[in-house]
Amino acid sequence: MNRPSFIFILADDLGYADLGCYGGRHAGSTGDASSSCSPNLDRLASEGLRFTDGYSNSAVCSPTRFALATGRYQYRLRGGADEPIASRTARGNPALGLPPEHPTLASLLRDAGYATALIGKWHLGFPPHFGPLKSGYQEFFGPMSGGVDYFRHCDSGGKHDLYDGEEEVRREGYLTDLLSERAAQFVSRQKGRPFFLSLHYTAPHWPWETREDEAESRRIADIAHADGGSVQTYFTMIRQMDEGIGRVLAALDETGARDDTLVVFSSDNGGERFSDTWPLVGKKMDLLEGGIRVPYIARWPRGFAAGRTTAQAAITMDWVATFLDAAGVAPHPAYPLDGISLLREPGPRELFWRMKFRDQKAARIGDWKYLSIEGDEFLYDLVRDSRERANLRHRHPEKFEALRARYQEWEATMPAIPADAKVSFVTSKATLAQPS
């Protein structure tokens, strides 16, 4: 039996219900009144397994990426405390990044003979202290920072940020297309060799630019702009990402590795201003379900029956344990995983989150959720009320106290939030109108 290969595709700030296979209420937003914005991902879901209760490790970018790299709660590393790592404070900082000595999914698979590549966004610290090639990837093409212009490839401070390996490079073109092309080329080269490809798109993260919006790129002064974009622009960005995913999947078919490759798609956190999270409430930066419940699609013809939907609760870091389990590779004994393999149908779960932003705390235990925001506490039955509108704290006081106590027990096992941890929230009430 061949060892499986792995492709992990990560979107950036994608909402829970944006894809056709997750509701697709905005079908037609890209200009075709009859179409989903995600035909290739919809097909992937029909050929594999779709999760209804998949979660990101955080409601914001880089913390989730720490968990995806290590298989452990991001709170265990100093860099995971910033929400998120920001270029202006992290460049040259030897504390804010993924330590090269820490084992990662990429390093463990590389040491087991896999070809490894990260095509896309890194956002786990800056050279010279950190980088993909220092953490298990043999190839890297993409930006180091959290967000870049799709045409100029400059970060939020105006610094050019596109790398091939450890060398800064200049390329012409729409970033989503550049990443898709490079990923398809990587897959095509791996005939007969097991590989691990991390394809981490920046789409549909701001700036709000489709393939046709190079003039908009020249107009905006700040890529975190609040004076542009639209629902149509946003869903076109998703559609163009989906087209690239289709090219990568076609390359996989052409190599004959389709049946032996586990392909997973997800998002780093919940959606931003133009996204759809129905029926959930909340968005990026919130520990409400809309900020942390994300699409999970997994296709592995050799391992999963096609066309299934599961309500199994899962979290980003579980995919590290899952990939290692599928590959027959043991985790590093000095760095035990917090995630668990989803190949073994784990059943009811205990999942935990915390954020410095608004002093948020959350625990999902079975079907119940404990939530605290700036000291206000809530209890929700997620099966009956995934929208989190019925606070059952006083109707079920024993359940509430049990979940709060369990959260406190878990938090006591984690490092405290550092006093100097930064929160970089790019939109304020003065620039983006907020609902009450």
Summary of predicted features, one role per range:
Residues 1-377, 382-405, 409-412, 417-436:
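Formylglycine-dependent sulfatase
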